[in-house]
Amino acid sequence: MRSYKAKMVEPITLPSRERREEVLAEAGYNAFNIPAENVYVDLLTDSGTGTMSDAQWAALFRGDESYAGSESFHRLREAVEDVTGFSRVIPTHQGRGAENVLYGCLVEEGDVVLNNAHFDTTRAHIANQGGDPVDCPVEGARDPVRDAPFKGNFSADRARDVVDDVGAERVPVVVLTITNNSTAGQPVSAANVRETAAFAEEIDATFVIDACRFAENAHFVRRREEGYEDRTVADIAREQLSHADAIVMSGKKEALVNIGGFVAVRDADLFERAKQRAILYEGFPTYGGMSGRDIEAMAVGLREAVEPPYVEDRVEQVEELGRMLEERGVPIYRPVGGHAVYVDAGELLSHLPSEQFPGQALVCELYREGGVRGVELGSFAFPGADRLELVRLAIPRRTYGREHLEHVADAAAAVGERAPEVTGLEVVSEPPTPELRHFSAELAPV
Ligand code: F0G
């Protein structure tokens, strides 16, 4: 049962089939180029696209816009301390701002950073510092059908191999991304958090948790890990974060806001250095990259994220979409993750070779069929990488209802029925930076 109802609505329309065809061609068969007014159900991302609560909207009016020493900052600091246990906090404009501040202090030319799996912006910030981001997924993480409770875990064995190779002194940072966005939103167990923290300590590295989906992760721990079934999500979340030396947070996910983020650290010296860098790139450390009113909304949202009805509801809605797709014979990555269902386009459109971007072809077909927007995470987004051809259907928080999800599942099923007729795509123009090509490149049917 949903634990909220709508108090404000936003009209959406499904453009006609002819119009959708035109829009696709005008967008160069790239969903990022589609104007949002032409999208019916938008599952491009769960980042900043959710619905705020009435309490969050009310909090906006309390925003203290003082340049220094804002009251709003103090309320955020308190919320962060209550929810995460960290008292040294710097607000940033979003998650990648937090990454820039933190990794700019910790990573130098020639360093290696280990992560269960780097999210794109994390990878880019490490690389921007001259570092080498290395993923350490567990066995089976890239197997879309293997059923295991914590496929998002960090492999300390793999990490030890890397350290044996390069030397511990070259690995200043170990990151754990919970849940693991680059591995189909899979959770990380509490045991793995402890194990990763111990590994980081062993090599004298700073242990960072990318906490943007921390409540969803805590929910999975409660559901799947022995000994946690009677604990609250809030309690589990705090326990998980208690092992970290620092956290980076995109508030656009589980602080339930449209914009914002923060970095929080334990060490007083690192805090001072991070504040200096924040002044350079974000703003004075009591507002960072945010307005006072947005900080207020984030302080309220962060507390809401660990309240019992919210996260249960949230993860179950994602599971529900997974179930609907499976009932209609659409292949998905199993088990379903916390924020999104990842459709296995390589399986659904198995006649298309990876050079013809089966994932991107599916993204286009979902739009053509139902005005649904998802995002490709395969050969188009990650050129040259050996990856599954996935399409992520990320669900904005507290935003869509069952009818919308049924519409999405029906659209995917309709594409599945005519799968052999779906044509592949080729890139016709792309920006100079290959890592960013999926955001703006244009394609055409082969
Ligand atoms: N870390 C993770 C694990 C993320 O998923 C994201 C963003 C970031 C950091 C960066 O945060 O966008 O606030 O700067 N993920 C979004 C997504 C964009 O669609 O998955 P940001």
Model regions and ranges:
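Conserved PLP-enzyme active-site core in the AAT-like
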Residues: 2-29, 33, 42-50, 56, ...
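Conserved phosphate/anionic-ligand binding catalytic regions in large, soluble enzymes, centered on
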Residues: 252-255, 341, 400
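Conserved small-domain helix->loop->beta segment predominantly found in fold-type I
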Residues: 286-360, 368-390, 423-432
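PLP-dependent enzyme catalytic core of the Aspartate aminotransferase-like
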Residues: 305, 369, 381-446
